């Protein structure tokens, strides 16, 4: 339930941010960090002509904000009557963008500091478990410091994984428990067991290949298709004015214009995803 999740995520959400700040400070103080940061903040304009770049970016935003995922419906059901949806959405989006920028600063500054910017374009899996560990080894000549920095990095990954697991499992368990009136704890337990068994596939020799396939499917094709279908369902099949009323129900100064809601959900969002 919401109370159990809240007790854990308040640590798993803020701890990675603290660790990222520590890593960013270290990365930005390295001699070659400027080259990496320059590569990030002044990108090649030709890269924006690649359609796959935009698909990857949309998939990243969808996954990072959990847009179109079951967890949004589950967490939404936990909101009280006084919740300011419009304000919360703005805060969440800006916070997410800030953390993403901080993460990229850590990556580019560290990779620039150890002279490994040529490997920055590797896949996310390779970057996290092959390229970045190599960069950590070359941080300094002090072995224990490199080991400490590596421990901080992987502690951050573990806390992020736990936080993601909570969101994924809660979205499934809350929906099933509410729909069929099952015991929420039992549903959560079975969801964890089934997910753990399925995840054993990634521990096989073909695990990396399967992980790439699932990652590309869920973060790109699947989320985009579901996004278009949900825009059609909400914009054309559901009374969109009710959505507008719910968004602005508890707002005082910042109110979402009705015309913008209609245009965004019915036309702009589907066209952008296509």
Label for each model-derived stretch:
Residues 1-15, 266-273:
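Hydrophobic transmembrane alpha-helices of multi-pass small-molecule transporters
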Residues 1-3, 76-82, 235-239:
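Structural signal for the C-terminal ends of transmembrane alpha-helices
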Residues 6-167, 173-190, 194-198:
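Membrane-embedded translocation segments of transport machinery
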Residues 97-102, 161-164, 200, 220-228, ...:
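Hydrophobic transmembrane alpha-helical segments of multi-pass transport and channel proteins
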Residues 107, 121-131, 188-192, 203-204, ...:
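Flexible glycine/proline-rich, aromatic-decorated loop/lid segments
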Residues 163, 214, 274:
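Hydrophobic, well-ordered secondary-structure elements that form the walls
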Residues 173, 180-192, 217-273:
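C-terminal membrane-solvent junction of multi-pass transporters and transport-like membrane proteins
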Residues 200-205, 271-273:
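Alpha-helical transmembrane segments and their membrane-interface junctions
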